A protein has these predicted regions:
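Metal-associated gating/positioning segment near the N- to mid-region
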Residues: 59-132, 148-151, 212, 241-244
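Histidine/acidic residue-rich metal-binding segments in metalloenzymes
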Residues: 123, 173-270, 279, 284-288, ...
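His/Asp/Glu-enriched, well-ordered alpha-helical/loop segment
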Residues: 223, 302-388
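Divalent metal-coordination and catalytic microenvironments
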Residues: 11, 27, 32, 58, ...
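Active-site metal-binding motif and surrounding structural segment of the metallo-beta-lactamase
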Residues: 42-62
């Protein structure tokens, strides 16, 4: 698709800065950037025959959304075993390119893919930037740093080396070596799995990194102009990540006042990623999730959201992230649900939630002042929505309402269908049975009674 000079007229502009909507405001996009807004935009376009007009009357014009937590390489696994043992590097690379196109169709023009299989996210980012693959702007991490105890996979993680999205590091020398290796191969961020599940402990994840280890990660990465993001699903991990110098904290589950104070003092940003938990809590029964977990997920959202409301009031930068890439968050489907959850659970206004998904998201893209707002000089990433998301934030989830997606000043084809993906049997765990076939399960009471008389 070629770069176009575009004048969008008649729409109501939400510019992403947090300012109120501006009715009937023109936006001029020229040479891949936002050049002017309002009457000056119309005047400048009038003398340029190369400008094509888009009539957005009755629609909302806003920056393309930024999803700050995606996993485009994962292939939508139903569980860790599929993710770890049913993926190949070449196929996952091709699938991630397919996924990138779906992301754009959902009105998301930028993503931060924090950890990935192999080093695919870095390669996908470069393929998109070089025009080989159609997709959103990307910032990429490599494989997450993990102790043997990190994450949710437990014993599936090998004791040494890499497993799927993770690389095990046992001491500070290994951490430094792996950070330097990832930076050598082009990552924008280093991700650390600060918490994990321990088989002998019941309940939520626990912190599995020492403070000194976390500080060493940050010092090493920051010396090489690379930011650090942490998976933190308890209060202690959030507190120590902030104190250690982490730039962005995912989840911040069960955050308490002490952890919040550390976040405020450090200037770290938060990306709660409620969407995955919300989908499990609200729809898990429809996809066979364990019933006893559904209310646990909802409780985690509610407890964490109460503290996020305090964080928002304290001026903490909050980003939106969907954790797209799992079976419960398939690519292209749920990117904008995080805005709905910020409104419903954290108490934000729709306008505040949009700011989290646009201007604030530029932080994850390492492009503050470049992306995320409709202001003169910003990159021309724009979406046009049929309706007003300030009246109902949920319309941003309805792809049929997205009438235009403009990425890097280029209009994205929204009409040509993307071929439907079929899932290969080799990608999935195939169960012979969901539970043991006992005789009492197989036979009726009458069968058992007759057999007892034989």
């Amino acid at each position: 698709m070629k770069l176009e000079n575009l004048l969008i007229t008649g729409g109501t502009v939400i510019d992403g800065t947090g300012a109120g909507p501006r009715a009937d405001t023109a936006v001029l996009l020229r040479d891949g950037v936002v050049e002017q807004l309002g009457a000056p935009a119309v005047q400048a376009a009038a003398t340029d025959p190369s400008v094509h007009e888009i009539d957005a009357t009755g629609r909302t014009v806003m920056p393309g959304m930024i999803d700050a937590h995606t996993h485009l390489t994962f292939g939508e696994p139903t569980g860790n075993d599929e993710l770890f043992f049913h993926r190949t590097e070449a196929y996952s690379s091709m699938l991630s390119a397919y996924n990138a196109k779906k992301v754009l169709r959902a009105g998301v023009t930028s993503v931060f893919d924090a950890d990935c299989l192999w080093n695919i996210a870095v390669e996908l980012r470069d393929a998109i930037e070089n025009g080989i693959v159609e997709g959103p702007r990307m910032r990429a991490g490599g494989q997450a740093l993990m102790t043997s105890l990190g994450g949710t996979a437990g014993r599936l993680i090998r004791d040494e080396g890499a497993t799927a999205y993770a690389t095990v590091v046992h001491d500070q020398d290994m951490m430094v070596k792996e950070i330097r290796r990832q930076i050598k191969y082009g990552v924008d961020w280093i991700k650390v799995m600060v918490t994990g599940l321990i088989p002998s402990m019941k309940g939520p994840e626990v912190k599995v990194w020492s403070f000194d280890e976390m500080r060493r990660v940050c010092d090493t990465a920051h010396e090489l102009n690379t930011k650090v993001v942490g998976h933190c699903r308890n209060a202690l991990s959030t507190r120590d990540a902030a104190r250690a110098g982490f730039d962005l904290i995912y989840h911040s589950s069960y955050m308490d006042d002490e952890a919040l104070e550390a976040v405020v003092e450090s200037g770290a940003a938060l990306c709660p990623t409620f969407t995955l938990l919300g989908n499990l809590a609200d729809y898990g029964a429809k996809i066979g999730s364990a019933p006893e977990l559904l209310e646990v997920f909802r409780a985690e959202i509610e407890v964490t959201a109460a503290m996020l409301s305090k964080a928002h009031a304290a001026g903490v930068k909050i980003l939106t992230g969907s954790e797209t890439g799992f079976a419960v968050t398939p690519v292209g489907e749920w990117h904008a649900r995080e805005l709905e959850m910020l409104v419903d659970y954290v108490g934000m206004s729709p306008l505040e939630a949009i700011t989290c998904a646009t201007a604030n998201g530029a932080f994850a893209m390492r492009a503050e002042g470049i992306l995320g707002t409709l202001e003169a000089g910003r990159q021309a990433d724009v979406i046009v929505i049929d309706g007003n998301p300030l009246d109902d934030i949920r319309i941003l989830q309805d792809k049929s309402r997205i009438s235009e997606v403009i990425s890097r000043g280029r209009r994205i084809d929204l009409l040509t269908p993307i071929p439907e993906r079929t899932v290969s049997p080799t990608e999935q765990v195939r169960f012979l049975a969901a539970c043991p076939l006992t005789r009492s399960l197989a036979l009726t009471e009458d069968d058992l009674e007759r057999l007892s008389r034989v």
